[in-house]
Amino acid sequence: MIQQETYLNVADNSGARKLMCIRVLGSNRRYAGVGDVIIAVVKDALPNMPVKKSDVVRAVVVRTKKSLRRDSGNVIRFDDNAAVIINADGNPRGTRVFGPVARELRDRNFTKIVSLAPEVI
C-alpha cells in the first residue's frame, strides 16, 4: 500500500535508486498497490545515468510489503516496496528489471516489465 511521501526502491537499471511517491494516479485515489501507476520524485540516483536526482517520473509499483490477496485465496507479500520507472507509453526506461515481480502486472498490460523480470510470482 503506497501513498504520498512513501519511499520505494527502484527495481531497474535506469539510474535511480530511491523514489518518493508524490501522487497516486487515478481519480481521487489515496493508495496504490501492485500494478498501479504513481508520480514520483527521484531521491537518490547514480551519476552519469539517464535519470537524475530530483527528476519527476512515472513509475509502476511491482512489489509491496502489504500483503496481496489473489482470487485463488493465496496471499503474497514481498520484503520491500519497489517500482519500475516507465515512460509516457508505459514502457520501462531501463533495460533490466531486478528481483521478482507480481503476476498482476501481466493483467495490467505491463508485459514488457514481466518479460524483463527474472522471476514472476
UniProtKB/Swiss-Prot annotation:
The keyword Transport does not apply. GO terms for molecular function: large ribosomal subunit rRNA binding; structural constituent of ribosome. SUPFAM superfamilies: Ribosomal protein L14. GO terms for cellular component: cytosolic large ribosomal subunit. Signal peptide: none annotated. Keywords: Ribonucleoprotein, Ribosomal protein, RNA-binding, rRNA-binding. GO terms for biological process: translation. The keyword rRNA-binding applies. Transmembrane segments: none annotated. Pfam families: Ribosomal_L14. NCBIfam families: rplN_bact. Part of the 50S ribosomal subunit. Forms a cluster with proteins L3 and L19. In the 70S ribosome, L14 and L19 interact and together make contacts with the 16S rRNA in bridges B5 and B8. HAMAP family: Ribosomal_uL14. Belongs to the universal ribosomal protein uL14 family. Binds to 23S rRNA. Forms part of two intersubunit bridges in the 70S ribosome. This is Large ribosomal subunit protein uL14. The gene is rplN.
